[in-house]
Design a protein with these regions (language model features):
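Extended, charged alpha-beta segments that form solvent-exposed binding/catalytic grooves
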Residues: 2-270
Length: 270
C-alpha cells in the first residue's frame, strides 16, 4: 500500500493562522480604500464555462486552463464515441483570471451602472510549471472601471492603488503603465511580422517576470529572428523614457495616439 502524502499538490500552499491574519489585514485595507473611491465588490464562481474561457488568453494561456472533466455517464459516452474533441470531454474550467469573468458579468447584467466601478479579490488557478515565486493557485486583486476609455478613469484607478500601498506602509514604489496600441507599434517598428505580433505581445508581458534574457530566449524559441528580437528590446527600453514618449506622441505614426494617452494619464495622475 502506497504512503499517503501529507503535502499539498505541487504549486499549491497551506496558509496557517499567522499567514491568514496578515492576508486578512491587507485585504481589509484594500477593501476600505477601494470602497472610499466608490468601487463596489464583485465575486464570481470558481468554475466558468470553457466556452467563456477559451480563446481569451492566446494559445499559451489556453494550455494553462484547468479543465473539469465530464462526470460518469457523459464522460463514458464521449470516450466510447471514438476520438472526442476537447469540449466533448470537458465544458467547464477553473477561473484563470478576474478579467474575463468581469467581461462576462458586464455582458450578462444589463442593469449595471454605465460606469461600473468594481474591485474583485479571489484566487485563480493556472496549470503552470511551479517555480520559485510562481504557484498554480494564487490570489488576484483587480480594480477596474468599465464603460469609459477616459484617462481620468485610469488615473482614478492608479490613485486608488497608490493609496492602498501608502496605507500599507510602502513609500518607494512605482506603478507601471502600458498601452496596447503603443506596444503594437513598437513590435511593428522592430520589424516583427504581423502574424507574430500576438505571440510577441504575450512574451513582452513577461518582461518583469523573466527579464530581458528570458524574453530574448522565448522569442527566439518561437521563431522570431535574433536581430528583430534585439531591435524590439532596444525599442522597449527607449520607450520607457519620457522624452521618447513625447517624441512618439508628437508624430503621426500608429503608436502616437497611445503615447499621447499615456502622457495625458501621467498628467492626470500627477
Amino acid at each position: 500500500m502506497s504512503e499517503i502524502s501529507t503535502k499539498p499538490p505541487s504549486g499549491m500552499r497551506d496558509f496557517l493562522a499567522s499567514d491568514v491574519a496578515r492576508r486578512r489585514h491587507v485585504l481589509g485595507v484594500v477593501q476600505r480604500v477601494y470602497e472610499s473611491f466608490g468601487f463596489v465588490p464583485l465575486e464570481t464562481p470558481t468554475i466558468e464555462n470553457l466556452s467563456t474561457l477559451l480563446g481569451k488568453y492566446g494559445p499559451e494561456g489556453d494550455q494553462l486552463l484547468y479543465r473539469i472533466l465530464h462526470r460518469r455517464e457523459r464522460l463514458q459516452r464521449a470516450l466510447a464515441a471514438g476520438t472526442p474533441g476537447e469540449l466533448d470531454l470537458a465544458d467547464e474550467g477553473l477561473r484563470y483570471d478576474l478579467t474575463v469573468p468581469l467581461a462576462r458579468v458586464v455582458a450578462n447584467y444589463r442593469d449595471l451602472p454605465a460606469y461600473y466601478k468594481r474591485y474583485q479579490i479571489q484566487p485563480v488557478w493556472r496549470a503552470d510549471r511551479p517555480a520559485k515565486g510562481r504557484f498554480r493557485e494564487f490570489w488576484q486583486c483587480d480594480v477596474d472601471i468599465t464603460g469609459t476609455t477616459s484617462v481620468v478613469a485610469d488615473a482614478e484607478v492608479c490613485g486608488a492603488v497608490a493609496m492602498v500601498l501608502r496605507e500599507l506602509g510602502f513609500t518607494d514604489f512605482k506603478i507601471l503603465l502600458n498601452h496596447r496600441e503603443l506596444l503594437r507599434s513598437l513590435v511593428a517598428t522592430a520589424g516583427i511580422a504581423p502574424e507574430q505580433e500576438g505571440l510577441a505581445l504575450v512574451v513582452i508581458d513577461k518582461l518583469d517576470k523573466v527579464g530581458v534574457d528570458g524574453v530574448r530566449s522565448e522569442l527566439a524559441a518561437k521563431g522570431v529572428e535574433p536581430a528583430k528580437v534585439d531591435a524590439l528590446l532596444a525599442t522597449l527600453d527607449a520607450a520607457r523614457q519620457p522624452d521618447m514618449l513625447r517624441t512618439t506622441a508628437a508624430g503621426d505614426g500608429d503608436g502616437s495616439r497611445g503615447a499621447r494617452e499615456l502622457l495625458a494619464l501621467l498628467g492626470a495622475a500627477a
